[in-house]
């Protein structure tokens, strides 16, 4: 992008200058609409989520055998919701802001198998592909007990096929571990910001790790090219995959059930705010879609990105979506939040969900580390840096009177609110790595 074009973009969208200056920015989109009006742009609906949910139930007996850690939840990969009241008090004191309502944490950081939100979409897409291959070969029917897949016969069948994915880390972990367990030959193309321990964990599962000196965009491009050379290879495309998106979307109905069990009401008088860290957008986009389908217009989803990688905010705010990358503006896309180090957002997710997402904000690495240390100290919960991106959300909503007024959030409604921070990863971080994170946080 030329200097002239950047100047023109800034003239039309002054917020872009603040992104270029790496400022922490908050933007509540004035153009959001109702679920009824916004849903046609997604191109998916309740039937698609039901299909995904049913598929995951079919695979539950297999997952219980293949991953005994899922036995306690009967083969369903799901995470707890916990209240973080001490952290709430800490944020209120730190930012001089009263957060009305309750502050809670969704611990996708501690999902079984791969310890991140990517255990939802990544594992689901691998299972969908495996099911399709086995059914087409006449080895499986949807009415079968899927635990039969945990056998040498099926491992040998899947060994004929390969799977490839490009990742900054967590998606690669989920897809790599799941694919290898089924018997697939699997390659994970890792960008320069991927953590060494994630690569080592994948290798320990027999995964071929392909390393790049460049960022996520290059890893995707090269991964796709390599996969095209092999007719038996299935490339999982984090930027455009509707299957991944639907794997994440099942989280909505699951959370609704959890809230029902906890006696938590979400309606016009009891709003739900959900703060989701965003990289390329597939994970938070799919979860937000599922939440909208479960709670309708009473849930308000807000995406959080690093100041050095604000790709979704940039794409949606300018309307350029995947036609612009942060690097076009001289933003380096280098962040400690490795799962969020993406320069170009998913055009599919941006265009599908822009009318249904209340807002976006950016956060510095320093602040993520700071909150990492605070959460560990206050609540004894340890996360990786990117999982803390959502922690500022309740502060921003509480401070933005214009947003509250436009959305008609009265003080009574805000007192009834639930603020849910979606913790996206960190449950499997090695002790030495976590100690380094805590040292950087000053704790």
Curated annotation (Swiss-Prot):
<comment type="similarity">
    <text>Belongs to the serine/threonine dehydratase family. DsdA subfamily.</text>
</comment>
<protein>
    <recommendedName>
        <fullName>Probable D-serine dehydratase</fullName>
        <ecNumber>4.3.1.18</ecNumber>
    </recommendedName>
</protein>
<dbReference type="InterPro" id="IPR001926">
    <property type="entry name" value="TrpB-like_PALP"/>
</dbReference>
<dbReference type="GO" id="GO:0008721">
    <property type="term" value="F:D-serine ammonia-lyase activity"/>
</dbReference>
<dbReference type="InterPro" id="IPR050147">
    <property type="entry name" value="Ser/Thr_Dehydratase"/>
</dbReference>
<dbReference type="GO" id="GO:0036088">
    <property type="term" value="P:D-serine catabolic process"/>
</dbReference>
<dbReference type="InterPro" id="IPR011780">
    <property type="entry name" value="D_Ser_am_lyase"/>
</dbReference>
<dbReference type="GO" id="GO:0009097">
    <property type="term" value="P:isoleucine biosynthetic process"/>
</dbReference>
<dbReference type="InterPro" id="IPR036052">
    <property type="entry name" value="TrpB-like_PALP_sf"/>
</dbReference>
<dbReference type="GO" id="GO:0030170">
    <property type="term" value="F:pyridoxal phosphate binding"/>
</dbReference>
<keyword id="KW-0663">Pyridoxal phosphate</keyword>
<dbReference type="GO" id="GO:0016836">
    <property type="term" value="F:hydro-lyase activity"/>
</dbReference>
<keyword id="KW-0456">Lyase</keyword>
<dbReference type="InterPro" id="IPR000634">
    <property type="entry name" value="Ser/Thr_deHydtase_PyrdxlP-BS"/>
</dbReference>
<feature type="modified residue" description="N6-(pyridoxal phosphate)lysine">
    <location>
        <position position="118"/>
    </location>
</feature>
<dbReference type="Pfam" id="PF00291">
    <property type="entry name" value="PALP"/>
</dbReference>
């Amino acid at each position: 992008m030329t200097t002239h074009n950047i100047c023109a973009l800034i003239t039309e969208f002054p917020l872009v200058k603040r992104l270029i200056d790496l400022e922490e920015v908050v933007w509540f989109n004035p153009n959001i609409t109702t679920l009824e009006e916004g849903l046609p742009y997604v191109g998916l609906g309740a039937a698609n989520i039901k299909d995904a949910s049913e598929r995951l139930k079919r695979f539950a007996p297999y997952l219980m055998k293949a991953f005994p850690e899922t036995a306690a939840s009967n083969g369903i990969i799901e995470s707890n919701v916990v209240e973080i009241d001490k952290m709430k008090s800490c944020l209120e004191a730190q930012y001089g802001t009263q957060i009305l309502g309750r502050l809670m944490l969704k611990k996708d950081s501690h999902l079984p198998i791969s310890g991140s939100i990517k255990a939802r979409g990544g594992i689901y897409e691998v299972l969908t592909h495996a099911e399709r291959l086995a059914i087409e070969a006449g080895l499986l029917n949807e009415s079968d007990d899927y635990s039969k897949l945990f056998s040498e016969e099926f491992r040998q069948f899947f060994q004929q096929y390969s799977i490839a994915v490009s990742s900054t880390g967590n998606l690669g972990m989920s897809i790599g571990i799941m694919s290898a367990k089924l018997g697939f030959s699997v390659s994970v193309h890792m960008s320069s910001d991927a953590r060494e321990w994630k690569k080592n964990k994948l290798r320990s599962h027999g995964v071929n790790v392909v390393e790049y000196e460049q960022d996520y965009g290059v890893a995707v491009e090269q991964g796709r090219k390599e996969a095209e050379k092999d007719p038996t290879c299935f490339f999982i495309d984090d930027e455009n995959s509707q299957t991944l998106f639907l794997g994440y979307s099942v989280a909505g109905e699951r959370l609704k059930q959890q809230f029902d069990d906890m006696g938590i009401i979400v309606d016009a008088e009891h709003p739900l705010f959900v703060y989701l860290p965003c990289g390329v957008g597939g994970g938070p986009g799919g979860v937000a879609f599922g939440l909208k389908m479960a709670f309708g217009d009473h849930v308000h989803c807000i995406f959080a990105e690093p100041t050095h990688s604000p790709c979704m905010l940039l794409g949606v705010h300018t309307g350029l979506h995947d036609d612009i990358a942060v690097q076009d503006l001289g933003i380096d896309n280098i962040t400690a939040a490795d799962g969020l180090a993406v320069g170009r957002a998913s055009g599919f997710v941006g265009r599908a969900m822009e009318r249904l997402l209340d807002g976006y904000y950016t956060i510095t690495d320093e602040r993520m580390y700071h909150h990492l240390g605070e959460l560990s100290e206050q609540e004894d919960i340890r996360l990786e840096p990117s999982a803390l991106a959502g922690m500022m959300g309740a502060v921003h909503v509480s401070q933005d009177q214009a947003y509250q007024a436009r959305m008609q959030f009265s003080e009574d409604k805000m007192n009834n609110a639930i603020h849910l921070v979606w913790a996206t990863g960190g449950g499997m971080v090695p002790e030495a790595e976590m100690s380094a994170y805590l040292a950087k946080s000053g704790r």
